[in-house]
Amino acid sequence: HQPLPAAATVISDVRCTDAFDKGKGRGAIILLETVLTDKATGDKLCTMDSVLFARGDGGYGGPQGSPDALPQAPIRPADHVVEFQTLDRQALMYRLSGDRNPLHCDPDFAAAAGFEKPILHGLCTYGHACHAVVRTTCDYHPEKLLSFSTRFSAPVIPGDMLQTHIWEEEEEIYFTTSVPEKDLIVLSNGFATLDI
């Protein structure tokens, strides 16, 4: 709704907008809407829509639909390709954001969850992609970014090189982020809108 202030006390109001039952043993999809409001002024700062996949929580008898179709990048070479090298210790540094999930720092916990080693926080990968879009399409003017969304497709391991492919279609931006040495798409169906 407006640029986020550098300092503010915000109120976060989260509500479930929908849920889809994928069936017993197949999970459920939960749609959430979060509205951030400046406590001092009452002004809406932003609205965030999230789609969560709840593994093992299907089969409860709810509707079996699915979220809206995801945006697709144009079928042509990307207008921009941006690379970011993540650091081997990046997940440990990113814990300063307050996410203390042991999946990002404990090798035994990560192995028990089925990963070869601790994985990078999804929000960190998301931030790298957002930085790439703001850098290439907004010339580092984040206030021009009106919306930003993507689908988390695969985990990133700290130390992976991230490569973000960006397509510009006037005020609409499409992007994907990959780990090229693994031939792995980690963020798919990326879509952003700009105030141009």
Model-derived features: positions:
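Hot-dog-fold acyl-thioester-processing enzymes
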Residues: 62-64, 71-140
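Catalytic-pocket segment enriched in acidic/His residues
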Residues: 108-184, 191
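HotDog/MaoC-like acyl-thioester-processing domains
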Residues: 2-81, 158-159, 163-196
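Residues that form or immediately flank small-molecule/cofactor binding pockets and catalytic motifs
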Residues: 55, 98, 155
